[in-house]
């Protein structure tokens, strides 16, 4: 900001503070009291928008509305303004002879951004705009800072994220995104509740970071003098509940991963995890596609959505593709025949797939998938059959134990869900954890820790179980056509602002 703009802004701040002082001198509270509203702006349009000018004059409909002044014009003894609430804007018409000298003076000196209450009659202007003719004007909150330019809103994307309140004031699209987010989560809950699932709450601070491959945030509990980890997944506590006999459970909550920030990643994000006893990953596939289609229908009214340049069809049944078949289809590499790690590394070299020296065959298969296949999966696709090495909590496949009964859901080349037939053999689970510990020793700090308490829970017997995790932020991105995860998080993680 140059010096001239800086001085101009200071002048505006001073003028508004002077108005604040004058209001107090007159005995008017610039940060007023409760105001009774009869209608929101969208109510007025839906209830009275179809009435003619003459019908409204005849009916003399009285309303009481409140909102923020977004535009203002007029001089002398009358003026117009648009006030905005959550749902939109409506025009108000204020005449001195209708509201009186004192209230008209309040209107005249009001600034853009001030919050006001209006009592009046609904009417239509000569050009047909539904409006409210004020009979009363109340200042509810004096705004001490000018809003961003009303014609351009917030052009600085970073400012939109840092000062989300300004973004919400100036962008109806942004407000609609977050209202839609709330509706998506509400419909998800409704769908699961209606299908017999029980919503539960489990700890966010864990003694052991488990349930996913990720770096945790670490904190310290002073009273207990112990390190705790902010949860990287909800999984292991929910599966303990399955052991305890709660047969269908879910939790919607925050998860924390001490990793990079990108258009798809935020260090804290919202997940839903659910588990169902006596089910497997194929049952969870059906649940996933039916639930997402239900949410789209209820919230958007359609299962055909636009995301960027793509038209996406969310109507079940979605494509199901084994990871090895997907790799073969898109790269020609065939991992169906068992091979040594040396042969797998040679195949990676042949196909220009980057790998690390510590990787086993299963890791290399996964690298093939991520580098050769993932970005081609646009329409909803269940990729199943992940290698055992990268799936320490999933049950081995009966027909080919190199792979697991696990799937990931990909839409627009992004992972949206991860699901297993859960591993319920405590001996196998302990061996998997031990293999993960070896990976940690070799430098993989995202490998799973040993969790003896969870092993003990499994030893009491967990029924065959299907489990699912969905990243809610990414689902909201998909259903609102948002290009970045920051567009669907009210307050995304940001670096400290540089002065």
From Swiss-Prot:
Reaction(s) catalysed (UniProt annotation): tRNA(Lys) + L-lysine + ATP = L-lysyl-tRNA(Lys) + AMP + diphosphate
Keyword match Aminoacyl-tRNA synthetase: yes
Positions annotated to bind Mg(2+) 1: 408, 415
One GO MF term: tRNA binding
Binding residues annotated for Mg(2+) 2, in chain numbering: 415
Enzyme Commission numbers on file: 6.1.1.6
Subcellular location: Cytoplasm
Name of one Pfam family that matches: tRNA-synt_2
Cofactor: Mg(2+)
Keywords of the record: Aminoacyl-tRNA synthetase, ATP-binding, Cytoplasm, Ligase, Magnesium, Metal-binding, Nucleotide-binding, Protein biosynthesis
Cofactor binding summary note: Binds 3 Mg(2+) ions per subunit.
Gene3D superfamilies cross-referenced by the UniProt entry: Bira Bifunctional Protein, Domain 2, Nucleic acid-binding proteins
Highest taxon listed in the record's lineage: Bacteria
GO CC annotation terms, alphabetical: cytosol
Main localization of the protein described in the UniProt heading: cytoplasm
GO terms (BP aspect): lysyl-tRNA aminoacylation
Keyword Magnesium: yes
Protein family (similarity comment): Belongs to the class-II aminoacyl-tRNA synthetase family.
Complex and partners: Homodimer.
Name assigned to this protein: Lysine--tRNA ligase
Organism, as annotated: Bacillus cereus (strain AH820)
Classification lineage: Bacteria, Bacillati, Bacillota, Bacilli, Bacillales
Gene: lysS
